[in-house]
Amino acid sequence: MTDASSTAVSPTAALSAAGVRIWLDDLSRERIASGGLQRLIAEKNVVGVTTNPTIFAAALAQGAAYDEQVRGLAATGVSVEDAIFEITTDDVADASDIFHDVYTATGGVDGRVSIEVEPGLAHDAAATIAEAKRLAAKVDRPNVLIKIPATVEGLEAITETIAAGISVNVTLIFSLERYRGVIDAYLTGLEKAKAAGIDLSGIQSVASFFVSRVDTEIDKRLTAIGTGEALALKSKAGIANARLAYKVYEEAFAGDRAKALVAAGANEQRPLWASTGVKDPSLPDTLYVTELVAPNTVNTMPEKTLDATFDHAQLAGDTVTGEYAGAQGVLDALAALGVDYDDVTATLEREGVDKFIVSWGELVETVRKALTDAQDSEAAQ
Protein backbone atom coordinates (compact mmCIF):
# COMPACT_ATOMS: atom_id res chain seq x y z
CA MET A 1 0.00 0.00 0.00
CA THR A 2 1.26 3.47 -0.87
CA ASP A 3 1.58 5.96 1.94
CA ALA A 4 -0.95 8.70 1.09
CA SER A 5 1.22 11.34 2.70
CA SER A 6 4.11 10.51 0.38
CA THR A 7 2.01 11.04 -2.74
CA ALA A 8 -0.06 14.01 -1.60
CA VAL A 9 0.46 17.18 -3.59
CA SER A 10 1.45 20.15 -1.44
CA PRO A 11 -0.70 23.29 -1.64
CA THR A 12 2.21 25.17 -3.21
CA ALA A 13 2.55 22.50 -5.90
CA ALA A 14 -1.20 22.62 -6.50
CA LEU A 15 -1.07 26.42 -6.71
CA SER A 16 1.69 26.20 -9.31
CA ALA A 17 -0.30 23.63 -11.28
CA ALA A 18 -3.24 26.07 -11.29
CA GLY A 19 -1.08 28.61 -13.11
CA VAL A 20 0.05 30.74 -10.17
CA ARG A 21 3.81 31.08 -9.99
CA ILE A 22 5.18 31.55 -6.48
CA TRP A 23 7.87 34.14 -5.87
CA LEU A 24 9.43 34.98 -2.51
CA ASP A 25 9.12 38.59 -1.40
CA ASP A 26 12.42 38.63 0.46
CA LEU A 27 16.16 38.35 -0.05
CA SER A 28 19.25 38.49 2.12
CA ARG A 29 22.86 37.40 1.80
CA GLU A 30 22.36 34.96 4.66
CA ARG A 31 19.52 33.32 2.76
CA ILE A 32 21.71 33.12 -0.35
CA ALA A 33 24.76 31.71 1.45
CA SER A 34 22.87 29.21 3.62
CA GLY A 35 21.17 27.40 0.76
CA GLY A 36 17.82 28.73 1.88
CA LEU A 37 16.79 29.82 -1.61
CA GLN A 38 17.64 26.42 -3.07
CA ARG A 39 15.53 24.73 -0.41
CA LEU A 40 12.53 26.93 -1.20
CA ILE A 41 12.90 26.10 -4.89
CA ALA A 42 13.08 22.37 -4.15
CA GLU A 43 10.50 22.14 -1.40
CA LYS A 44 7.98 24.96 -1.79
CA ASN A 45 7.78 25.60 -5.53
CA VAL A 46 9.38 29.05 -5.36
CA VAL A 47 10.42 30.19 -8.85
CA GLY A 48 11.39 33.84 -8.32
CA VAL A 49 12.26 36.60 -5.89
CA THR A 50 11.19 40.21 -5.41
CA THR A 51 13.12 42.79 -3.42
CA ASN A 52 12.57 46.39 -2.38
CA PRO A 53 14.38 48.97 -0.25
CA THR A 54 12.56 47.80 2.89
CA ILE A 55 13.82 44.24 2.37
CA PHE A 56 17.42 45.33 1.84
CA ALA A 57 17.33 47.69 4.83
CA ALA A 58 16.19 44.80 7.04
CA ALA A 59 18.78 42.40 5.60
CA LEU A 60 21.68 44.78 6.15
CA ALA A 61 20.59 45.59 9.69
CA GLN A 62 20.83 41.94 10.74
CA GLY A 63 23.75 39.56 11.08
CA ALA A 64 27.30 39.64 9.79
CA ALA A 65 26.82 38.37 6.24
CA TYR A 66 27.74 41.74 4.73
CA ASP A 67 30.70 42.55 6.99
CA GLU A 68 33.46 41.39 4.65
CA GLN A 69 32.12 43.31 1.67
CA VAL A 70 31.50 46.41 3.79
CA ARG A 71 35.12 46.32 5.02
CA GLY A 72 36.36 46.08 1.44
CA LEU A 73 34.15 48.93 0.30
CA ALA A 74 35.15 51.07 3.28
CA ALA A 75 38.81 50.58 2.38
CA THR A 76 38.21 51.98 -1.10
CA GLY A 77 36.44 55.06 0.23
CA VAL A 78 33.33 54.68 -1.92
CA SER A 79 30.25 56.80 -1.29
CA VAL A 80 27.32 55.38 0.64
CA GLU A 81 25.21 55.36 -2.53
CA ASP A 82 27.86 53.45 -4.48
CA ALA A 83 28.22 50.97 -1.62
CA ILE A 84 24.47 50.33 -1.66
CA PHE A 85 24.63 49.83 -5.42
CA GLU A 86 27.43 47.27 -5.07
CA ILE A 87 25.85 45.39 -2.16
CA THR A 88 22.34 45.11 -3.56
CA THR A 89 23.36 44.26 -7.12
CA ASP A 90 25.72 41.57 -5.83
CA ASP A 91 22.87 39.95 -3.90
CA VAL A 92 20.57 40.10 -6.91
CA ALA A 93 23.24 38.69 -9.23
CA ASP A 94 23.92 35.80 -6.84
CA ALA A 95 20.20 35.08 -6.45
CA SER A 96 19.81 35.23 -10.24
CA ASP A 97 22.50 32.56 -10.56
CA ILE A 98 20.66 30.35 -8.07
CA PHE A 99 17.47 30.69 -10.10
CA HIS A 100 19.17 30.22 -13.47
CA ASP A 101 18.11 26.57 -13.77
CA VAL A 102 14.50 27.61 -13.17
CA TYR A 103 14.91 30.35 -15.76
CA THR A 104 16.20 27.83 -18.29
CA ALA A 105 13.60 25.17 -17.49
CA THR A 106 10.73 27.65 -17.93
CA GLY A 107 12.03 29.14 -21.16
CA GLY A 108 12.89 32.40 -19.44
CA VAL A 109 9.44 32.96 -17.98
CA ASP A 110 10.35 32.36 -14.34
CA GLY A 111 13.53 32.18 -12.31
CA ARG A 112 13.26 35.96 -12.14
CA VAL A 113 14.86 38.20 -9.50
CA SER A 114 13.71 41.82 -9.13
CA ILE A 115 15.69 44.87 -8.04
CA GLU A 116 14.10 48.28 -7.63
CA VAL A 117 15.28 51.64 -8.90
CA GLU A 118 16.01 54.15 -6.16
CA PRO A 119 12.54 55.28 -4.99
CA GLY A 120 13.47 58.93 -4.85
CA LEU A 121 13.46 58.84 -8.66
CA ALA A 122 9.79 57.79 -8.86
CA HIS A 123 8.71 61.11 -10.38
CA ASP A 124 11.70 61.57 -12.70
CA ALA A 125 11.33 59.53 -15.88
CA ALA A 126 14.76 60.29 -17.35
CA ALA A 127 16.60 59.45 -14.12
CA THR A 128 14.57 56.26 -13.69
CA ILE A 129 15.42 55.12 -17.23
CA ALA A 130 19.12 55.80 -16.66
CA GLU A 131 19.09 53.97 -13.32
CA ALA A 132 17.20 51.00 -14.79
CA LYS A 133 19.83 50.64 -17.50
CA ARG A 134 22.64 50.99 -14.94
CA LEU A 135 21.15 48.30 -12.69
CA ALA A 136 20.57 45.91 -15.58
CA ALA A 137 24.13 46.38 -16.83
CA LYS A 138 25.64 45.87 -13.36
CA VAL A 139 23.65 42.75 -12.46
CA ASP A 140 24.23 41.47 -16.01
CA ARG A 141 21.97 38.43 -15.76
CA PRO A 142 19.28 37.48 -18.28
CA ASN A 143 16.77 36.73 -15.52
CA VAL A 144 16.86 40.06 -13.69
CA LEU A 145 13.78 42.28 -13.60
CA ILE A 146 14.11 46.00 -12.94
CA LYS A 147 11.33 47.32 -10.71
CA ILE A 148 9.85 50.64 -11.79
CA PRO A 149 6.91 52.25 -9.92
CA ALA A 150 3.69 52.89 -11.82
CA THR A 151 3.67 56.63 -11.26
CA VAL A 152 2.70 58.84 -14.20
CA GLU A 153 6.39 59.49 -14.81
CA GLY A 154 7.09 55.80 -14.34
CA LEU A 155 4.94 54.95 -17.36
CA GLU A 156 7.38 56.72 -19.68
CA ALA A 157 10.27 54.98 -17.96
CA ILE A 158 8.59 51.59 -18.40
CA THR A 159 8.19 52.16 -22.13
CA GLU A 160 11.78 53.25 -22.68
CA THR A 161 13.26 50.51 -20.49
CA ILE A 162 11.26 47.82 -22.30
CA ALA A 163 12.23 49.47 -25.62
CA ALA A 164 15.88 48.95 -24.64
CA GLY A 165 15.23 45.22 -24.26
CA ILE A 166 15.30 45.25 -20.45
CA SER A 167 12.73 43.19 -18.53
CA VAL A 168 10.61 45.15 -16.05
CA ASN A 169 8.58 44.50 -12.92
CA VAL A 170 6.09 47.37 -12.70
CA THR A 171 5.41 48.00 -9.02
CA LEU A 172 2.99 49.98 -6.84
CA ILE A 173 -0.10 49.52 -9.02
CA PHE A 174 -3.35 50.22 -7.19
CA SER A 175 -5.92 51.51 -9.66
CA LEU A 176 -7.49 49.83 -12.67
CA GLU A 177 -7.05 52.95 -14.78
CA ARG A 178 -3.34 53.17 -13.98
CA TYR A 179 -3.04 49.45 -14.76
CA ARG A 180 -4.44 50.11 -18.24
CA GLY A 181 -1.73 52.74 -18.61
CA VAL A 182 0.89 50.23 -17.50
CA ILE A 183 -0.21 47.73 -20.14
CA ASP A 184 -0.14 50.47 -22.77
CA ALA A 185 3.36 51.48 -21.67
CA TYR A 186 4.51 47.87 -21.96
CA LEU A 187 3.00 47.38 -25.42
CA THR A 188 4.44 50.69 -26.63
CA GLY A 189 7.86 49.62 -25.37
CA LEU A 190 7.55 46.31 -27.21
CA GLU A 191 6.59 48.12 -30.41
CA LYS A 192 9.66 50.34 -30.11
CA ALA A 193 11.88 47.34 -29.35
CA LYS A 194 10.51 45.52 -32.39
CA ALA A 195 11.18 48.54 -34.59
CA ALA A 196 14.76 48.57 -33.29
CA GLY A 197 15.24 44.93 -34.23
CA ILE A 198 15.37 43.64 -30.64
CA ASP A 199 14.30 40.02 -30.04
CA LEU A 200 11.00 40.39 -28.18
CA SER A 201 11.07 36.86 -26.79
CA GLY A 202 13.76 37.80 -24.30
CA ILE A 203 11.72 40.61 -22.74
CA GLN A 204 9.56 39.69 -19.76
CA SER A 205 7.36 41.89 -17.60
CA VAL A 206 5.04 41.55 -14.64
CA ALA A 207 2.55 44.13 -13.39
CA SER A 208 2.54 44.14 -9.58
CA PHE A 209 -0.94 44.88 -8.30
CA PHE A 210 -0.97 45.56 -4.55
CA VAL A 211 -3.76 43.83 -2.65
CA SER A 212 -3.76 44.03 1.14
CA ARG A 213 -2.87 47.73 1.23
CA VAL A 214 -6.14 48.45 -0.59
CA ASP A 215 -8.05 46.70 2.18
CA THR A 216 -6.09 48.49 4.88
CA GLU A 217 -6.93 51.93 3.47
CA ILE A 218 -10.54 51.22 2.54
CA ASP A 219 -11.30 49.35 5.78
CA LYS A 220 -10.12 52.41 7.70
CA ARG A 221 -12.67 54.50 5.79
CA LEU A 222 -15.42 51.90 6.25
CA THR A 223 -14.78 51.84 10.00
CA ALA A 224 -15.15 55.62 10.08
CA ILE A 225 -18.52 55.34 8.29
CA GLY A 226 -19.47 52.74 10.86
CA THR A 227 -22.80 51.50 9.48
CA GLY A 228 -23.61 47.81 9.22
CA GLU A 229 -23.55 48.08 5.47
CA ALA A 230 -20.09 49.64 5.56
CA LEU A 231 -18.65 47.15 8.03
CA ALA A 232 -19.95 44.24 5.94
CA LEU A 233 -17.70 45.38 3.09
CA LYS A 234 -14.48 45.25 5.11
CA SER A 235 -11.66 43.10 3.70
CA LYS A 236 -13.39 42.72 0.33
CA ALA A 237 -12.04 45.61 -1.74
CA GLY A 238 -8.49 44.36 -2.25
CA ILE A 239 -9.55 41.05 -3.74
CA ALA A 240 -12.33 42.65 -5.80
CA ASN A 241 -9.89 45.20 -7.20
CA ALA A 242 -7.37 42.51 -8.11
CA ARG A 243 -10.01 40.35 -9.77
CA LEU A 244 -11.08 43.26 -11.93
CA ALA A 245 -7.43 43.88 -12.76
CA TYR A 246 -7.26 40.34 -14.13
CA LYS A 247 -10.28 41.16 -16.29
CA VAL A 248 -8.38 44.18 -17.64
CA TYR A 249 -5.41 41.88 -18.37
CA GLU A 250 -7.59 39.37 -20.22
CA GLU A 251 -9.22 42.05 -22.34
CA ALA A 252 -5.97 43.82 -23.17
CA PHE A 253 -4.09 40.72 -24.26
CA ALA A 254 -7.04 39.44 -26.27
CA GLY A 255 -6.85 42.64 -28.33
CA ASP A 256 -5.35 42.89 -31.80
CA ARG A 257 -2.45 45.09 -30.70
CA ALA A 258 -1.18 42.65 -28.08
CA LYS A 259 -1.87 39.61 -30.24
CA ALA A 260 0.23 41.05 -33.06
CA LEU A 261 3.15 41.54 -30.68
CA VAL A 262 2.79 38.04 -29.23
CA ALA A 263 2.76 36.68 -32.79
CA ALA A 264 6.06 38.53 -33.29
CA GLY A 265 7.55 36.69 -30.31
CA ALA A 266 6.56 38.94 -27.40
CA ASN A 267 5.43 37.69 -24.00
CA GLU A 268 2.27 38.74 -22.25
CA GLN A 269 2.82 40.94 -19.22
CA ARG A 270 1.64 38.78 -16.35
CA PRO A 271 -0.37 40.14 -13.42
CA LEU A 272 1.53 39.76 -10.16
CA TRP A 273 -0.25 39.88 -6.81
CA ALA A 274 1.88 41.82 -4.34
CA SER A 275 1.22 42.87 -0.76
CA THR A 276 -0.31 39.44 -0.11
CA GLY A 277 0.61 39.15 3.54
CA VAL A 278 -2.53 39.42 5.67
CA LYS A 279 -2.46 42.48 7.93
CA ASP A 280 -5.72 41.79 9.82
CA PRO A 281 -5.25 38.90 12.31
CA SER A 282 -8.96 38.09 12.15
CA LEU A 283 -8.61 37.01 8.50
CA PRO A 284 -7.32 33.68 7.15
CA ASP A 285 -3.56 33.96 6.70
CA THR A 286 -3.73 32.66 3.11
CA LEU A 287 -6.67 34.87 2.05
CA TYR A 288 -4.77 36.79 -0.63
CA VAL A 289 -3.48 33.52 -2.08
CA THR A 290 -6.54 31.30 -2.21
CA GLU A 291 -8.88 34.05 -3.43
CA LEU A 292 -6.61 35.09 -6.31
CA VAL A 293 -5.97 31.85 -8.18
CA ALA A 294 -5.96 32.38 -11.95
CA PRO A 295 -3.86 31.18 -14.89
CA ASN A 296 -0.67 32.99 -15.87
CA THR A 297 -0.30 34.98 -12.66
CA VAL A 298 2.41 35.41 -10.06
CA ASN A 299 1.94 35.71 -6.31
CA THR A 300 4.94 37.12 -4.47
CA MET A 301 4.73 36.17 -0.81
CA PRO A 302 6.55 37.12 2.36
CA GLU A 303 7.97 33.98 3.96
CA LYS A 304 5.24 33.85 6.60
CA THR A 305 2.56 33.72 3.90
CA LEU A 306 4.55 31.18 1.89
CA ASP A 307 4.86 28.92 4.93
CA ALA A 308 1.14 29.22 5.68
CA THR A 309 0.28 28.44 2.07
CA PHE A 310 2.53 25.37 2.04
CA ASP A 311 1.12 24.20 5.36
CA HIS A 312 -2.62 24.59 5.03
CA ALA A 313 -3.91 26.60 2.06
CA GLN A 314 -7.24 25.24 0.84
CA LEU A 315 -7.38 25.70 -2.92
CA ALA A 316 -10.59 25.61 -4.94
CA GLY A 317 -9.37 26.09 -8.49
CA ASP A 318 -9.74 29.38 -10.35
CA THR A 319 -11.17 31.93 -7.92
CA VAL A 320 -10.94 34.94 -10.22
CA THR A 321 -12.41 34.63 -13.70
CA GLY A 322 -15.94 33.74 -12.64
CA GLU A 323 -16.10 36.51 -10.06
CA TYR A 324 -16.07 39.71 -12.11
CA ALA A 325 -19.71 40.67 -11.49
CA GLY A 326 -19.34 40.21 -7.75
CA ALA A 327 -16.09 42.16 -7.73
CA GLN A 328 -17.68 45.06 -9.58
CA GLY A 329 -20.56 44.90 -7.11
CA VAL A 330 -18.13 45.44 -4.24
CA LEU A 331 -16.64 48.54 -5.86
CA ASP A 332 -20.11 49.85 -6.71
CA ALA A 333 -21.24 49.36 -3.11
CA LEU A 334 -18.18 51.22 -1.84
CA ALA A 335 -18.89 54.11 -4.19
CA ALA A 336 -22.51 54.22 -3.00
CA LEU A 337 -21.22 54.65 0.55
CA GLY A 338 -19.05 57.57 -0.51
CA VAL A 339 -15.70 55.75 -0.54
CA ASP A 340 -13.75 57.57 -3.26
CA TYR A 341 -11.86 54.92 -5.23
CA ASP A 342 -9.67 57.44 -7.05
CA ASP A 343 -8.71 59.11 -3.79
CA VAL A 344 -7.93 55.74 -2.19
CA THR A 345 -5.64 54.64 -5.01
CA ALA A 346 -3.93 58.03 -5.30
CA THR A 347 -3.32 57.98 -1.53
CA LEU A 348 -1.88 54.47 -1.71
CA GLU A 349 0.45 55.34 -4.59
CA ARG A 350 1.72 58.42 -2.77
CA GLU A 351 2.18 56.52 0.50
CA GLY A 352 3.79 53.59 -1.32
CA VAL A 353 6.47 55.81 -2.84
CA ASP A 354 6.95 57.64 0.46
CA LYS A 355 7.34 54.37 2.42
CA PHE A 356 10.04 53.16 0.05
CA ILE A 357 11.81 56.52 0.28
CA VAL A 358 11.82 56.18 4.08
CA SER A 359 13.17 52.62 3.76
CA TRP A 360 15.82 53.86 1.36
CA GLY A 361 16.82 56.44 3.94
CA GLU A 362 17.10 53.69 6.55
CA LEU A 363 19.23 51.68 4.13
CA VAL A 364 21.49 54.68 3.56
CA GLU A 365 21.95 55.19 7.31
CA THR A 366 22.60 51.48 7.92
CA VAL A 367 25.27 51.37 5.23
CA ARG A 368 26.74 54.71 6.31
CA LYS A 369 27.15 53.40 9.86
CA ALA A 370 28.60 50.11 8.64
CA LEU A 371 31.16 51.91 6.48
CA THR A 372 32.10 54.27 9.31
CA ASP A 373 32.43 51.41 11.81
CA ALA A 374 34.62 49.48 9.37
CA GLN A 375 36.85 52.51 8.78
CA ASP A 376 37.13 53.15 12.54
CA SER A 377 37.99 49.50 13.17
CA GLU A 378 40.70 49.57 10.51
CA ALA A 379 42.14 52.79 11.92
CA ALA A 380 42.27 51.33 15.42
CA GLN A 381 44.38 48.36 14.32
Curated annotation (Swiss-Prot):
One of its GO terms (biological process) is carbohydrate metabolic process. Its EC number is 2.2.1.2. One of its GO terms (cellular component) is cytoplasm. Pfam families: TAL_FSA. Keywords: Cytoplasm, Pentose shunt, Schiff base, Transferase. It catalyses: D-sedoheptulose 7-phosphate + D-glyceraldehyde 3-phosphate = D-erythrose 4-phosphate + beta-D-fructose 6-phosphate. It is found in: Cytoplasm. Pathway: Carbohydrate degradation; pentose phosphate pathway; D-glyceraldehyde 3-phosphate and beta-D-fructose 6-phosphate from D-ribose 5-phosphate and D-xylulose 5-phosphate (non-oxidative stage): step 2/3. GO terms for molecular function: transaldolase activity. The active site is at K147. Transaldolase is important for the balance of metabolites in the pentose-phosphate pathway. HAMAP family: Transaldolase_2. Belongs to the transaldolase family. Type 2 subfamily. This is Transaldolase. It comes from Leifsonia xyli subsp. xyli (strain CTCB07). The gene is tal.
